Structure formats: C-alpha cells, structure tokens
Amino acid sequence: MSKKPSAGGKIQWTKMFRKLSPYTIRKGFRYMKHYGPKEFWIRLHERFEPEEVPYGPWYRAYIPTEETLETQRKQKFDYSPLISIAVPAYQTPVEFLRQMIESLIVQTYSNWELCIVNASPDNEEMQKVLAEYSAGNSRVRFCNLKENLGIAENTNRAFAMTKGEFVGLLDHDDLLAPNALYEIVKILQDHPQADALYTDEDKVTTELDEHFQPHLKPDFNLDLLRSNNYICHFFVVRKSIVEKAGGFRKEFDGAQDYDFIFRCTENAGEVLHVPEILYHWRTHKASTADNPASKMYAFEAGKRAIEAHLERTGTKGEVSHTQDLGFYRVKYPVQGKPLVSVIIPNKDEKETLQTCLEMLEKNTGYQNFEIIIVENNSTTDEIFRYYKELSGNRKIHLLRWGKEFNYSAINNFAAAHA
C-alpha cells in the first residue's frame, strides 16, 4: 500500500525553513532524484506535519528526574553482572568522543566497563582524550590499532577486550541514556536466564539540542527482524553467545550488526525487549541515521544477511528490496494449499463491504480462502438484506458480535471460529 500525505495535513513551513542549510537542501535534492517528486512530497509531509503528540515535550517530560537517577545509583541488585560496552572508534570528532564516554560515566548502574578500539593511530586529539579518560577512570580502557581494519574487525578487537558477562554495542558518536544499564539489569532480576536484550531508541541532532523520531519497538519478532533491523540499538548480549556466534564478519560490512544480531538471536534462548528509550542515535552528515543513501552498499549487505540467516535456519524464502531503504520482503514458498481466513468486522456498511468482497474475488488468484464477516450491532434493513444475499456463498460465514465495538476483541473472536 503506497503512502499518502494525511488529508488536510499542513507542513510547518516556519519549522522547515529554520532547518534549511546547504546540507539539508542537497539531501532533499538527492532524495527527490532517487525517489521522484511524489515520494519527496510525502516525506516532506511526514517530517514537517504537526505531530499529534509532539515528541520533544513528551521526551522532556518522560526522562527520569535527577532525584530518580540518584535513587537508582543507590539501588543494590541481587544480580549485578559486569556489562562491557564495546566501541570501535575511527576518526571520531573529539567532542562526540567525549560525549559518548561521559554518557557511560554518568550511568546509574556502576558495574560496567568501556572498551574502545581506536583505529585512528595518527589522530593525536583522539589519543589525548582516550588517555585522559583512561587515566581518570579504571573502567575506561582503550586499545590503539596500527591501522584501520574496517568496522567488523575493529569491533571484534573491542569484543576481545571485554571481560563482562554481557556485551553491549555502542557507536562512537552516539549516547546512552543515564539509566540505560540500570534498566537492563533491572529486567534481568526477573529474567536472569535471558541471553540478549534490546531497548527502544530515538535520534538526536548533532548539537544534542533536539530529540526526534522515537523508535518504540515490539517484543522479539523474528518475522519483523527479517524485514528490517528493528532491534538495531541498544543491543546487549551474553559474551558466551558472542563467542558462539563468532563476532562480526567483514563480508557484511555496512550491515555487520544486522548479520550479528541474526546469529546471536539464533543461538540465544530468551531475547528480551526493554521498553524504554535508552539509546540516542546522533545524526550528522555522514550518519546513516540522517542520510541512509550515504551508505547504499549497506542495504545490499542487509539483504545478504537475511539470506544467510534463512540458509542457516533451513528456511526457504526469496529476499528482495523494497522502495524504502533498509526494509526487505521475504517471500516464502506456499506449502500445500492451506485455508486462508479473511476477517471483516462490519456495522451497517453495505457498499463498503460489497466493494471489499468484489475486490477480493477479482484480485485474489489463490482460491482456498474463506471470508468471516463479523456483524456488530447493525441497524439498517439494507445490510441485513445483503447478508441474506450472501448466505448462498459457501466461502462466506457470518458471525454476530453483540457487544460494543472493540477491534481486537472482534478479530480474536473471529479467529477462534476460523
């Protein structure tokens, strides 16, 4: 289904003009050239239409207070595993590097270590910053490589430095919320057997003055993971699983984390979702967070990561790109001819229902399906006459839901009768 701008939605022109810069203008032209004017206009609406619930004020009201953070610092857990944060760093602006390290130092959970691999041997500013923090905090350790080995091998060198029971992945220019590790260890108290965890995230501007695009994720969903790397940040996994999975693989550079997450979840027992925004993905000119087209090769690597996962798990499926970068479709072969049940809740909608049924019949090549219409307190004679007309169609079944409208309950009711 194609996206459409919301009817009557108005672009906040003042907000848009405030954000104009040579970079954002170039980015806009790139997007329009790649996707065309229609998709560009849709994206413009998505980005600058007024939000029903503006995220910025919600975020500021949502973050824990200093009093809450101080209470967390005093919390003693029965299970307090060492969490190692692995960071491959390459030509990191020193301001970003400091902010990343500081986001660990202010964590309300204290049993952590930060393992940074510096692949910029000639960057003296980075060397000074890393030496400064390492000297001032024993939990901050770093290793200088003689040369840049690439993102996969740099990360593996960081993995090799870790001593913790769990390992978390943090990009060199991103930030953790101060309660990130606390919330992870808190959920581990009730699920000490969990092998992997992931959190919600948002994006933040280069200057850290605006949070936007929150990504509130579902619990672990393998089918969704096969369509896009929805887990992404912040991902924490037992080191034993890292060792079993084998670390990052350079042949998947650009989507090395996607491939890694697949292999970790394949080897993990319980995978937990921590429903808190605990990771802040910084956007800037070279960041895929703000400019997906800056790493086009990454999306082909993502496709190969899914294909490799399907092969390892013995799952037959054909993987293809979609028009949205980083999103994929897996087309599975149909096994036999299973019955498909189509559920349609309805109240008094004769014309809409008739159109729906006609389109199903016209556009569906697969014929082994049934249609379950759930009648919900209709009052017009017209709809009941139409139900009577449909009674001769053996594919159509009519159920009655006499309670008040509840979309989820109605569909669950129909599914039980499918």
Regions found by a protein language model. Give the residues of each.
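Acidic donor-binding segment of Leloir-type glycosyltransferases
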Residues: I105-E147, E361-R400
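Donor nucleotide-sugar recognition loop
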Residues: G246-F262, Y297
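Catalytic donor-sugar/metal-binding loop of nucleotide-sugar-dependent glycosyltransferases
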Residues: K250-F252, F262-W281, A286, R304-T322
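N-proximal low-complexity "stem/linker" segments adjacent to membrane-targeting elements
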Residues: K33-I105, E307-K362
